[in-house]
Design a protein with these regions (language model features):
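Flexible hinge/capping segments at coil-to-helix
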Residues: 59, 157-176
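Periplasmic-binding protein-like
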Residues: 149-155, 234-272, 294-312
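N-terminal secretory signal peptides
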Residues: 1-22, 30-40
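Short helix-initiation/N-cap motifs at beta->coil->alpha
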Residues: 106-117, 200-210, 214
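Extended ligand-binding regions for polar small-molecule ligands
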Residues: 43, 90-99, 160, 168, ...
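Bacterial lipoprotein signal-peptidase II cleavage site
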Residues: 43-50
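Extracytoplasmic small-molecule ligand-binding "clamshell" domains
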Residues: 50-129, 139
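A ligand-binding cleft/hinge motif common to bilobed small-molecule-binding domains
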Residues: 131-139, 188-191, 218-252
Length: 312
């Protein structure tokens, strides 16, 4: 059962680069420092509430800050080379929470697989990491409607020598396959017939790129967006054309969204109202575009249909 969007983390392979040239290890160290300050400064915000639908929004307004659980994953939520919090989810959170009367956002670092446990244990207030909405996760948290939709793609060596374009190719050509810890792509590969115990699990797309470049694997599977972004500075690897994985024999489209504790329906609903205003005005696309999102990633998918296992 998947715990993470796309992810619990495994030990790194080699030196993990990110697309800014900073190692992921140092990136997470920077996030940790900021997160520690945020946890100290907001320790009383996330106390339990007996109010129906929760009163977290009122408490966040009073505190003036919301703590965002992020996983240090480009482009979803990370600390940039200047030490600033950015990514599609934090930038969207800034806009929406400002509209809701909360002036500041504060990053709290987490391994991807620890985001839901951290949310449930009130380490942070909201998960802002581009987390995929799926039935398993919907049993543990509640989601806003997706702010983006996403297909899959592979990282392969230049020229794609094995001709790998989907999970069926990976199985039929007996390719050495890797993906990220807890990524939904594990399920997609297994559904296509790949033996789960043969999958190399790495922390993220940067480690996946390293593994492909070093020849440890033939292919790494991730989102179309993250794979095309991470290979931009690589002379040895490329991203394949985006494709929809098959789930129960049907093409599946994922959607990423903010996650909230199940008791905080009032906050989730207020967030959704502002999110839909941004969608209607086109401002959502303007916020996400600098992070590599295209109009093809804009979506009308709902959390309700994804929680029910639908994909459009």
């Amino acid at each position: 059962m998947l715990s993470g969007s796309r992810a619990a983390m495994a030990p790194p392979i080699g030196n993990e680069r990110d697309t800014t040239g900073t190692t992921r290890r140092s990136l997470l160290a920077g996030v940790a420092a900021l997160g520690a300050l945020g946890a100290a400064g907001c320790s009383r915000v996330a106390t339990a509430s007996t109010t129906e639908g929760g009163d977290l929004l009122e408490r966040l307004k009073a505190a003036g800050v919301v703590r965002l659980g992020i996983a240090g994953e480009i482009p979803f939520g990370y600390i940039d080379k200047n030490g600033e919090l950015t990514g599609e989810a934090p930038e969207l959170a800034r806009v929406i929470f400002k509209r809701l009367g909360v002036d500041r956002v504060q990053p709290v670092p987490s391994e991807f697989g620890s985001l839901i446990p951290g949310l449930k244990s009130q380490v942070f207030d909201v998960v802002a990491a581009g987390m995929y909405v799926n039935p398993d996760r919907c049993e543990q948290v509640i989601f806003a409607d997706p702010d983006y939709q996403m297909l899959d793609a592979f990282i392969v060596r230049k020229g794609n020598p094995k001709g790998l374009h989907d999970y069926k190719d990976v199985v039929e050509k007996k390719a050495k396959f890797a993906t990220g810890t807890g990524y939904a792509e594990i399920q997609y590969a297994v559904e296509a017939g790949y033996k789960e115990s043969d999958i190399l699990i790495v922390p993220d797309q940067v480690a996946g790129l390293n593994a492909v470049e070093a020849g440890r694997v033939d292919v790494f599977a991730g989102t179309a967006l993250t794979t095309r972004e991470v290979v931009k500075k690589s002379s040895k690897a490329e991203s394949t054309k985006a494709f929809a994985p098959l789930v129960k024999g049907k093409p599946h489209v994922d959607g990423g969204a903010f996650a909230f504790r199940p008791t905080e329906t009032r906050l989730r609903d207020a967030f959704n109202v502002e999110l839909h205003k941004l969608k209607k005005s086109g401002e959502l696309f303007r916020i996400l575009q600098p992070f590599g999102f295209t109009k093809a990633e804009m979506t009308d998918l709902t959390a309700k249909e994804l929680c029910a296992g639908g994909t459009g």
